[in-house]
Amino acid sequence: EILSGLVGSEMCIRDRLNEQLRVNDLTHNTSTHFIAADVRGLFGTVFNDFGSHFVCKDTNGEQPLDSMIVSVTHDEEGLVTTIDEKRHGLQDGDYVTFTEVQGMSELNGIEPRRVTVKGPYTFTIGDTRSFGEYRGGGIFKQVKMPEILNFKSLRESQQAPEFLFSDFAKIDRSMILHIGFEALSAYEEKNGHSPRPRNADDANALLALARDIMQSRNQLPEGEEATKLSNWILTELSYQATGDLSPMVAFIGGFVAQEVLKACSGKFHPLMQHMYADVLEALPKDVPNLPESEFSPQQSRYDGQIAVFGKTFQARIGNTRQFLVGSGALGCEMLKNWSMMG
């Protein structure tokens, strides 16, 4: 009832899954776009639900293509040939219309025709047998057609997620992290706090919750290597649950900001629907050998970073002196990250 009259976007940032589900149950069948995001140390996640009937007016934001044509066949599948100095650039499923065609004048201003690409200079546009004979000239122009996107609710998507892979070298990690973030939320709901940095007992408790979820969905890892990878990622997620890194927040925050603009404008294809990212390669190799006390909170503004890298690493960062050449947009962002990292 609260959201039924609203049109806009609702964002859940670092809320527990139960709260996300509650809000999304309200937004899914209204005109309210829902985005959830979370960053835990070197891990990040984003989820979109723009409703069951979201109109994307322009999927890529590029200028419509156009080119001169040199022939159109009189056929069940009329074949259009463009000038050979320039590839037409179309893809299957694109739509085109025509102007300045001589002879086959029915094409001029015709309702957009769906394209099937046959080559870099040829494509078909459907039946042209009822048209006049082509005599010459003509220009095709691509028409951007609205695309209707059907988003699943968060409750439905938790059971059968659709992923955007942020790193094709880590395709096998998305499902692990999907279950891991759900288990992390369950842990926090049960215990009232996040797992402690580098605490083995808390990590084992989160692993047990994750295994229960995997078992209930028949998604247990198969084989020793897959099990080892899953356990390592889930353990690191537990260890870094209180982590808060400025560069990761900038990355996920920038991604979410773009999704908000897509939701409001209907321009550019939005995320469908989950995205998980990790940069565990940034973790120093000696971190697993350090004691838990190295990562304990110091009651400082850098506790979120200490939880991931340790206080010795933080002290090293604090004593580093960097020289940055240039202070444009990227330079300013770099300075911001450096200053927030200490």
List where the protein language model places each region.
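Hydrophobic/small residue at the entry helix of a nucleotide-binding pocket
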Residues: 330-331
